[in-house]
Amino acid sequence: MTFRPLLDRVVIRRAEGNTQSKGGIIIPDTAKEKPQEGEVIAVGPGSRDESGKLIPLDVKIGDTILFGKWSGTEVKIDGEDLLIMKESDIMGIVANTVPTAANAA
């Protein structure tokens, strides 16, 4: 099935949560917190202003984003658990920067 979000909505694939704590303790599924990070897999065309002009979204497919703990609506599409939320629920885009030798020193 193909799903196309409307207006300023985006479809998010939630990032995988950690299965082990920093101290090495294995965390059971029932105690895991859901990650607040995910990948944008579909975007709507944008919202409209008072004059009817289309305002495009800032996020695009493939962006890694951060969102609030209670943001979005959980849905299952083609057997995959996804989130649908408005762009305003997204806190920011995570920049995938690779550390250089100068930055590492």
Swiss-Prot record:
User: Do the record's keywords include Cytoplasm?
Assistant: yes
Q: Quote the Pfam families the UniProt record gives.
A: Cpn10
Per its UniProt record, what Gene3D superfamilies does this chain match? GroES chaperonin (2.30.33.40)
One GO term describing the cellular component: cytoplasm
Please name the SMART domains in this protein's record: Cpn10 (SM00883)
Which GO molecular function terms does the record list? ATP binding; metal ion binding; protein folding chaperone; protein-folding chaperone binding; unfolded protein binding
Q: Which UniProt keywords apply?
A: Chaperone, Cytoplasm, Plasmid, Stress response
The record's similarity note reads:
Belongs to the GroES chaperonin family.
What the protein does comes down to: Together with the chaperonin GroEL, plays an essential role in assisting protein folding. The GroEL-GroES system forms a nano-cage that allows encapsulation of the non-native substrate proteins and provides a physical environment optimized to promote and accelerate protein folding. GroES binds to the apical surface of the GroEL ring, thereby capping the opening of the GroEL channel.
What is this protein's record name? Co-chaperonin GroES 3
Q: Which organism is it from?
A: Rhizobium meliloti (strain 1021) (Ensifer meliloti)
